[in-house]
Amino acid sequence: MKLEHPDRLMNRTPLSLAALEVHDAFAERHIGPDSADQQAMLEALGFASRAALIDAVIPKTIRRTEPLPLGPFAQPKSEAEALATLRELADRNQVFRSYIGQGYYNAHTPTVILRNVLENPAWYTAYTPYQPEISQGRLEALLNFQQMIVDLTGLAISNASLLDEATAAAEAMTLLQRIGKPKSNVFYVADDVLPQTIEVVKTRATPVGIEVKVGPAADAANANAFGVLLQYPGVNGDVRDYRALAEAIHAAGGHVVVAADLLALTVLTPPGEWGADVAVGNTQRFGVPVGFGGPHAAYLAVRDEFKRQMPGRLVGVTVDAQGNPALRLALQTREQHIRREKATSNVCTAQALLAIMASMYAVYHGPHGLKTIALRVNRIAALLAEGAKQLGYTLVNETFFDTLTFETGARTQALHDAALAKRINLRRVSDTQVGLSVDETTTRRDLADLLEVFAQAAGAKIVPQVDALDSTIAASDTASVPPALERTSAYLTHHVFNRHHSETEMLRYLRSLSDKDLALDRSMIPLGSCTMKLNATSEMLPVTWPEFGQIHPFAPAEQTVGYREMIDQLEAMLVAATGYAAVSLQPNAGSQGEYAGLLIIHAYHASRGEAHRNVCLIPASAHGTNPASAHMAGMQVIVVACDAQGNVDIEDLKKKAEQHADKLAAIMITYPSTHGVFEQNVREICEIVHAHGGQVYVDGANMNAMVGLTAPGQFGGDVSHLNLHKTFCIPHGGGGPGVGPVAVGAHLAQFLPNQISSGYERAPNGIGAVSGAPYGSASILPISWMYIAMMGAKNLTAATETAILNANYVAKKLAPHYPVLYSGPGGLVAHECILDLRPIKETSGITVDDVAKRLADYGFHAPTMSFPVPGTLMVEPTESESKEELDRFIEAMIAIREEIRAVEEGRSDREDNPLKHAPHTAAVVIANDWKHAYARETAAYPLPTLIAKKYWPPVGRADNVYGDRNLFCSCVPIADYE
């Protein structure tokens, strides 16, 4: 509803209250162009209405004929109404004090980090730092993360985060498979590894022919395994000296992975010092809310000789064009967008925002502060152990850092009942054992309450007192950590971890980093296939509510009623949007959703006695995650050609489907295609594959062009993943978090992922767990719930239509200057367009990279470079950008084309021109020695509008070759900046 100007309303008969109530105002906040601007854009395209444009763009054979069936959410809610409704759900959760542990802990998020990172759009709306010159702030924060991991684990090099600890362990397994014993397919897992980790490792192992054996750690050296996974400390709390075992494993030709608790490593000998080849773990307890399981940043660190086999992103140090230190993503040739099925992993989105929070936690506390926290946690555990012993309980693990396991016998249920009465959760180890893990939030009062619980269950009338226990411990020679495992090596010695301990200094450090970067809070980010749309503040607010942020993923079901109702509602919303029958929210990235979907397809074929079906057809234009995921799922990738228009070559598809009919498992297609068009024959593609026994996987990366207009489940798809961090407004966070739900047809619903170890069994024949928590990154799901609730069915459809309108407007305006490579009937595109810069390179020597860097001088993040076609830019404006911002981008692109024309016509030198030397830093522009053939003003202010609003790149063009040849992935000494 559009409100008229109050002055006009006052001159009329008073309206009713109902007429003045506005429920859909959020849609006007979310959708950038107003009605007048949309009409002007439509006129430029030659259409009278948005509906007419959509009729011309989307094939009639796949159009939805009914509104989105959103049920109670069909009508939009105002921001206040949606928040109130979600608050009602949140209030149905019960926030108990959870000592369940098992890899998840309560943590204090320093408020300076909460407000200035997690709640700051300068951080959470940024994209993955593939354009290093405009990403130096978050690259530095991620480099700090890598330095933190390297120091604490004692290994040579760390990546910049993975999805969760369980996934990191699975990645470590496949890493060791690539480099390990050629005659062994056995991966040995100690039986005191976290149960959810064992489950995810098993899920990953089966499709690629790895046999997982689980047993006592002591037997690992005799298992003839290419790799061994140890937990340090173990799930039940034991702190074991694995030095001799690691030597024996190495002597037998195996390698060692250690899943290590990061806080414990501040006081324990790091695994890199006693024989670990790889270390993995979770950084959640470094200031990140537990959030019902996620999102959290995992880590993976390796010995130096394994660095080129690492999965995930890696920040490295290089130099810029002026020879100054600069940061960039290093060794990108390992990644799926380049290596495809030969990549080290299918990981795309990781957990950058959470990694940044964890690194800043270490920066803020420093080594002394972290060690103090660790010693306090260990002391509280020791006090509790002593008190429980005095009450007659037997401690199973005599060594510990923060986790205790007790023999409780017949008192087990009484102990749980007494704890629940005090709103406390303990870990249910077995019918005769109880476990608990303390953390930095555990206070003296909490300890007293726990002692009361143990006393009550024991029938004791006298409760041990904390001060008395403390005196007993102080006078005792007994150590909870074996003296041989006490850490002696220094860590976090770099200056960044030792100078920002006051809030003033920390605040300014965070501001200095965010000022270096371009995020959505500054300008449009027109990245094709990435959907950088508005992440509204009202959507983000609930993320930090305690009722969502402070719930343990394995808390009893009766404490998570509101969470599960919200999740059920969101799943129903996504079912409505996709046209499928069921959705699982467990995958915590799009790559993981792809992987889960392919495992589901395999499970379906196996249930029909056709487990031999393992061929996956993938168009040549597919995103690199598709073949990488297919390879991980144990499938053979067969590439299907595309025709001159960028569509799937139907004749080649028929040929390949017929050729592989006996083994055809699936086809993976993206719709609209990665070429930015709605293929007219998508139904025929689906029918061909079905006729030859395969299933159709529709990649949902481009769902932002389909919501409300068409649905993969209705035009022939059997399974899709979605990217909630694209279509449904979860922010990209500078490279994560993400959520990649997998949506399936009715015949596949029985195969959705379970998680047996936590009791989450939703599907009778479900595949194994694909992430460590039952609902993946649960605490950010309210973002998508809020978006859908505030938009309603009609406005979600309007958003899709506007995204298509914006893309066609940009394509139309830029077509005279840059050829639009692919289009559908009438020269129209879907929600993105590909600009062909290859002819420009031939005529001027200017490359797509030059244009991307020059855009930084104009204050823009570059569109997607050289995907899916080398030498092109793929532009996706989304529905959230206003016409004014679109015109600003168009103006910049046209101005750059004129700069290129000057080179073509000989008015500018082919090497000494503003594109070849872009981006230009302030230091370069004001330097006394200016030797370029173009003016300083041309370098700095190529358009007059930039004078009032100028973004200055902090570094010049990064030297990629130097960075990979001189790989350095730790913090740079301060002297290098001086």
Curated annotation (Swiss-Prot):
This enzyme's EC code(s): 1.4.4.2
Modified residues (N6-(pyridoxal phosphate)lysine): K726
Top-rank taxon: Bacteria
GO biological process annotation, one example: glycine decarboxylation via glycine cleavage system
Cofactor(s) this protein cannot do without: pyridoxal 5'-phosphate
Oxidoreductase recorded as keyword: yes
One of the record's GO molecular function terms: glycine dehydrogenase (decarboxylating) activity
Enzyme superclass (EC): oxidoreductase
Keywords: Oxidoreductase, Pyridoxal phosphate
GO cellular component: cytosol; glycine cleavage complex
Similarity-based family: Belongs to the GcvP family.
Oligomer status and interactors: The glycine cleavage system is composed of four proteins: P, T, L and H.
HAMAP family listed in its UniProt record: GcvP
Protein name listed in UniProt: Glycine dehydrogenase (decarboxylating)
